[in-house]
Amino acid sequence: MRIVFMGTPGFAEVILRALVGDKDIEVVGLFTQMDKPFGRKKELKAPETKTYILENHLNIPIFQPQSLKEPEVQILKDLKPNFIVVVAYGKILPKEVLTIAPCINLHASLLPKYRGASPIHEMILNDNKIYGISTMLMDVELDSGDILESASFLREDYLDLDALSLKLAHMGAALLLSTLKNFSSITRKSQDHMQASFCKKITKSDGLVGFKDAKSLFLKSLAFKSWPEIFLENGLKLLEVELVENEKSHKEGEILEIDEKGVLVGCLKGSVRIARLQAVGKKPLKAKDYLNGKRLKIGGILA
């Protein structure tokens, strides 16, 4: 089975590894995003999928086109894929590509929920009790094609973005292999477009928080752990946040307790414990040390 794989981040790399490791599958090409400037020095960083292929010296050609027009359409045709697999690629496939071979997208939600760029973030932010993933036959609309298969699990503990992404990626790898190997016998299911919800691309401003609702702040700390993290108006980052309770009413940002575990901060609804704080341009500090440096005490306001 000849597969062209289209994917970019670490989530997609987990899936690519599973395909490469399967004896029935030959990955005949990787399409991924272009290398991008990263960090303060703006050094070019390759997508994780590309890095995986290069570091393991795999004989898989890598393509990083700016768009999927000619000559890329002809390149895809020449690779003669049985399937084109798309996992967090970051580009919309034009009709000319969709007609080359069945295009199967692995999407990290139980479609039609959370179509779009940030489904895992949305599952966390909405405090979902069930996490899931779907394989879908792609069409010209965004994440609207027929559902092929899906898998899910019941949440037992809160998971941050990295942990949930990894768990869903491994679940998704098994699901995708099942879809590819059983494609001809799978009964496709049309999506109920009336039930669809959409999620946007995450931006830096999404990390801005205040001390209004403890549960919401805690969920944002999980969803935005890797980037953009969560921060106050003055840029102070709140690191390692724990939800303590979500009922009592306090002044916004009121310091309730200070100990070695962190600072207990009140919200209009609930309270959170924050283990570390990081001022703009500074290294992270234990919350207790940061507060001492700012001469903030119990009863003061963290803002």
Curated annotation (Swiss-Prot):
Cysteine-cysteine disulfides: none
Catalytic activity: L-methionyl-tRNA(fMet) + (6R)-10-formyltetrahydrofolate = N-formyl-L-methionyl-tRNA(fMet) + (6S)-5,6,7,8-tetrahydrofolate + H(+)
E.C. number(s) listed in UniProt: 2.1.2.9
Alphabetic keyword roster: Protein biosynthesis, Transferase
An example Gene Ontology molecular-function term: methionyl-tRNA formyltransferase activity
GO process terms (BP): conversion of methionyl-tRNA to N-formyl-methionyl-tRNA
Membrane-crossing segments per the record: none
Any one of the GO CC terms: cytosol
Record flagged with keyword Cell wall biogenesis/degradation: no
Binding site for (6S)-5,6,7,8-tetrahydrofolate: S109, L110, L111, P112
Leader sequence residues: none
Domain of life of the organism encoding this protein: Bacteria
Family: Belongs to the Fmt family.
Function: Attaches a formyl group to the free amino group of methionyl-tRNA(fMet). The formyl group appears to play a dual role in the initiator identity of N-formylmethionyl-tRNA by promoting its recognition by IF2 and preventing the misappropriation of this tRNA by the elongation apparatus.
PANTHER family: METHIONYL-TRNA FORMYLTRANSFERASE (PTHR11138), METHIONYL-TRNA FORMYLTRANSFERASE, MITOCHONDRIAL (PTHR11138:SF5)
NCBIfam families linked: fmt
Name of the molecule in the record: Methionyl-tRNA formyltransferase
Organism: Helicobacter pylori (strain ATCC 700392 / 26695) (Campylobacter pylori)
